[in-house]
Amino acid sequence: MGKVPSVGLTVSGIPVNAAVKAGDLVGISGGKMVPALAAVAGQVKALGIAAASYAVGDTGAIHVVAEVDGFAGLVAGDAQYLSETAAGTVQAAAPVGVGKLSQVAGFAVAADRVVFAFQDAGVVL
């Protein structure tokens, strides 16, 4: 994926602290862009989608709302959650296990397309 088209707000001028690919779910840690992950409560929650691929030291942009295709086998209307195992990606089910982040990142609108509009993250109790 080269660049991800935005359908809403884009925030630019963000320093990058870890390599990210276009379309990765990202958050901010220490004022810098990093991949988001739901493995434990202390991980970085997702704030948006990387607008392009960036290397450490780059300055990047985040799409806060975006429609992204290239998925397969999704069910329209189903929530897509921040992944607990693969940084920067989504999973179809809410994370299970005490202390993990549970964050809806967006919703499938077709078998191959997700509209991302990030919700606040909670911690699984």
Question: What residue ranges belong to the model's regions?
Answer:
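Glycine-anchored, exposed beta-strand/edge motif detector
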Residues: 1-125
